[in-house]
């Protein structure tokens, strides 16, 4: 990895993390359900699906932009560790149905949004 690529990943990661912090603060919890985390994970999944859809369908995305958006921004925006912690917290509080819904919603929403982003990139 060269310095330009490292800077692209670092800048994207910083912006993604700041955006996550902002968005998560808008809707952190709704009736014990961590909506903010679901939102940021869904948005990152959509962007990543769109980016890799562009690549798959033949659009030339420079490698430094792929690093900035994919690894950097989407990596900083999404948060598997917070999702895991929030699910664990729901289990610890004996909110078993909410914990299961959190897992199901995150898996379904993120995979669906990757797919939708991928398809929308086709043009």
From Swiss-Prot:
One Pfam match, by short name?
Answer: CRCB
Instruction: Give me the Gene Ontology terms describing cellular component.
Output: plasma membrane
Topology of the protein relative to the lipid bilayer: Multi-pass membrane protein
**Which keywords has UniProt assigned to this entry?**
Cell membrane, Ion channel, Ion transport, Membrane, Metal-binding, Sodium, Transmembrane, Transmembrane helix, Transport
Catalysed reactions, as listed in the record: fluoride(in) = fluoride(out)
What are the TM regions of this chain, as residue ranges?
Answer: 7-27, 39-59, 68-88, 101-121
Transmembrane keyword on record: yes
List the GO molecular function terms: fluoride channel activity; metal ion binding
Chief subcellular location:
membrane
Protein residues bound to Na(+): 75, 78
User: Which BP terms from GO are recorded?
Assistant: cellular detoxification of fluoride
The record's annotation in HAMAP family points to: FluC
According to its UniProt entry, the function of this protein is described as: Fluoride-specific ion channel. Important for reducing fluoride concentration in the cell, thus reducing its toxicity.
For this chain, the family text in UniProt reads: Belongs to the fluoride channel Fluc/FEX (TC 1.A.43) family.
This chain belongs to the protein called Fluoride-specific ion channel FluC
Q: Which gene encodes it?
A: fluC
